[in-house]
Amino acid sequence: MEARAIAKYMRISPRKVRLVAENIKGKPVEEALNILKFTPKKGAEMLSKVLYSAVANAEQIPGVDVDSLCVDIVKVDEGPTWKRIQPRAMGRAYRIRKRTSHITVVVKEM
């Protein structure tokens, strides 16, 4: 059986989250949580919250052993971009793009 968790509109660039997401693909949940715990990135904290949620969703399925779960899919998609204006010299304005991410984590039994 598999369980999934999705976090939408997370205020971090998908490129930055993917750096961390590659480290936990295919790993057992306990090992993945340890990796995320000691990774000094903002994306690691966000991914660990989504992973905890996926494990909690798996607990709701009858007959699933939580200790035998492994990370099957970690998908980081681009969400909508917030556009802001940065005033510059001589009346110009630069555009600031504040990117968001949709993070999907799927766990399954080994």
Swiss-Prot record:
Pfam families linked to this entry: Ribosomal_L22
GO cellular component terms, semicolon-separated: cytosolic large ribosomal subunit
GO biological process: translation
Highest taxon, organism lineage: Bacteria
Keywords, sorted A to Z: Ribonucleoprotein, Ribosomal protein, RNA-binding, rRNA-binding
GO molecular function: rRNA binding; structural constituent of ribosome
Assembly behavior: Part of the 50S ribosomal subunit.
Known function: This protein binds specifically to 23S rRNA; its binding is stimulated by other ribosomal proteins, e.g. L4, L17, and L20. It is important during the early stages of 50S assembly. It makes multiple contacts with different domains of the 23S rRNA in the assembled 50S subunit and ribosome. The globular domain of the protein is located near the polypeptide exit tunnel on the outside of the subunit, while an extended beta-hairpin is found that lines the wall of the exit tunnel in the center of the 70S ribosome.
UniProt similarity note: Belongs to the universal ribosomal protein uL22 family.
Protein name: Large ribosomal subunit protein uL22
Species of provenance: Maridesulfovibrio salexigens (strain ATCC 14822 / DSM 2638 / NCIMB 8403 / VKM B-1763)
The organism's taxonomic lineage, starting at the top: Bacteria, Pseudomonadati, Thermodesulfobacteriota, Desulfovibrionia, Desulfovibrionales
